[in-house]
Amino acid sequence: MASRDFLRVFGAGEGAGPPGDAGAGQPDDDELSLGLSLGGRFGTDAKRPRLARSSSIASVCSVSSLHADPSPAAPLPLLRTTSLPTETEEERWRRREMQSRRRLEARRKRVERRNSMGSVSVAPADAVSGRRSNASQGSNSASTTEQGIGGSMFNQSADAKSPSTSDNRNQNDMLPPTKAAEKPLNGTATEQQPRLRTLGSLTTRTGSTSDIRKLMMEDMPMVSSKVEGPNARRIDGFLYRYKKGEDVRIVCVCHGSFLTPAEFVKHAGGGDVPNPLRHIVVNPAPFS
């Protein structure tokens, strides 16, 4: 292309035109800035239209708007961004009124429930008093029949029934009124079961108590005084448990005081003796 223009300018021929026609399609001035000006390639040519500036900020105006209308535009009102709708005063008052109504309704229900529970507790009290009167009548009738059978058997059964009667009453108090009213005639059958349980518990309790007594007698044996004289008397006590290096102490049964062997003999009326341990007798354990 350059060789063709060169031949057209410097070559001879009919098609060759004036030198001014060759640069008609080229720009008037050569581009020497290489696009490094503020406006880029288009900043050097004032005749060419400028590019409109695009901005994401609404308050910044573009170049075209500045040329069109120099007066500043009115600022737009900022919209409230929220995930919940704005609550008016009427809605707030309505919501508070509904909450107060719910509280009053819950309080009324609690009062009604409390009153109903009080009335129910009064009714079982009357039923319990009726059951106790029936139980007393049944025990009186049973005692009359046992008196006709024999006096000795009555005494033994009365001693055995005394703990079972209280257990039976406690069990009847814990039963609901419907079950107690349905079975008023089975008093004898209900009395036998607590009696068996009571005897078993008494047996285990007696066994454990006897074991405790044996251990206590082994650790602290019973002693008594053996004194001669006009003011002599027998004083019982038990040897208090002591460790090695401690003084021997005897607990007097009549007063519960801790005494030394000499004081124990003097308390029995023996006076001052040279060897008080000879006047103290250790009693054998009754459970051995």
From Swiss-Prot:
<comment type="similarity">
    <text>Belongs to the Ninja family.</text>
</comment>
<feature type="region of interest" description="Disordered">
    <location>
        <begin position="66"/>
        <end position="207"/>
    </location>
</feature>
<dbReference type="InterPro" id="IPR031307">
    <property type="entry name" value="Ninja_fam"/>
</dbReference>
<feature type="region of interest" description="Disordered">
    <location>
        <begin position="1"/>
        <end position="50"/>
    </location>
</feature>
<protein>
    <recommendedName>
        <fullName>Ninja-family protein 6</fullName>
    </recommendedName>
</protein>
<dbReference type="InterPro" id="IPR012463">
    <property type="entry name" value="Ninja_motif"/>
</dbReference>
<feature type="compositionally biased region" description="Polar residues">
    <location>
        <begin position="131"/>
        <end position="173"/>
    </location>
</feature>
<feature type="compositionally biased region" description="Gly residues">
    <location>
        <begin position="12"/>
        <end position="23"/>
    </location>
</feature>
<feature type="compositionally biased region" description="Low complexity">
    <location>
        <begin position="195"/>
        <end position="207"/>
    </location>
</feature>
<dbReference type="Pfam" id="PF16135">
    <property type="entry name" value="TDBD"/>
</dbReference>
<feature type="compositionally biased region" description="Low complexity">
    <location>
        <begin position="76"/>
        <end position="86"/>
    </location>
</feature>
<feature type="compositionally biased region" description="Basic and acidic residues">
    <location>
        <begin position="91"/>
        <end position="103"/>
    </location>
</feature>
<dbReference type="InterPro" id="IPR032308">
    <property type="entry name" value="TDBD"/>
</dbReference>
<dbReference type="Pfam" id="PF16136">
    <property type="entry name" value="NLS_NINJA_AFP"/>
</dbReference>
<dbReference type="GO" id="GO:0007165">
    <property type="term" value="P:signal transduction"/>
</dbReference>
<dbReference type="InterPro" id="IPR032310">
    <property type="entry name" value="NLS_NINJA_AFP-like"/>
</dbReference>
<dbReference type="GO" id="GO:0005634">
    <property type="term" value="C:nucleus"/>
</dbReference>
<dbReference type="Pfam" id="PF07897">
    <property type="entry name" value="EAR"/>
</dbReference>
<dbReference type="GO" id="GO:0045892">
    <property type="term" value="P:negative regulation of DNA-templated transcription"/>
</dbReference>
<keyword id="KW-0539">Nucleus</keyword>
